[in-house]
Amino acid sequence: MATELVVQSERAFQKQPHIFQNAKKGAGRRWYKDVGLGFKTPAEAIYGEYVDKKCPFVGQVSIRGRILTGTVVSTKMHRTIIIRREYLHFIPKYNRYEKRHKNLAAHVSPAFRINEGDVVTVGQCRPLSKTVRFNVLRVVKHTEGPKQFGKF
């Protein structure tokens, strides 16, 4: 994935807005929160060093609205993934269902290591960019092996 391990990779100095940093205070102070709704804060968010203002665990974003699940299709963007949500649509004329899908862009925190094929749970938040309105809350790693039964 395209997430960096270096904290200071931007032009401006990256710091958490909640923590006052000076020479007298020891390093290692970190602010994090519980997003609620039964989702655990990952250990990387608690003990990590990254700074991400759009992260639901250490940033200024609150999760409200819909909670969705989908499969990761693309991880090519910086801190953003594309997930695919498949569903069945009923056709009354033929009394049958057809498979359809929607692609959804979601912000991924550096606390997660995501690869294509992983199943992620995302929560709705305020608009983070033109297309991104969701944030990754949980990741279930994709297991390799024989072809497995999916949702549909």
UniProtKB/Swiss-Prot annotation:
Tell me which UniProt keywords the record has, alphabetically: Cytoplasm, Nucleus, Ribonucleoprotein, Ribosomal protein, RNA-binding, rRNA-binding
The domain of life is: Eukaryota
The miscellaneous remark of the record is:
There are 2 genes for uS17 in S.pombe.
Question: One Pfam family from the UniProt entry?
Answer: Ribosomal_S17
Naturally occurring in which organism (per UniProt)? Schizosaccharomyces pombe (strain 972 / ATCC 24843) (Fission yeast)
| Record protein name field | Small ribosomal subunit protein uS17A
Instruction: Answer yes or no on keyword Transport.
Output: no
Which NCBIfam families does UniProt cross-reference here? PRK08572.1, uS17_arch
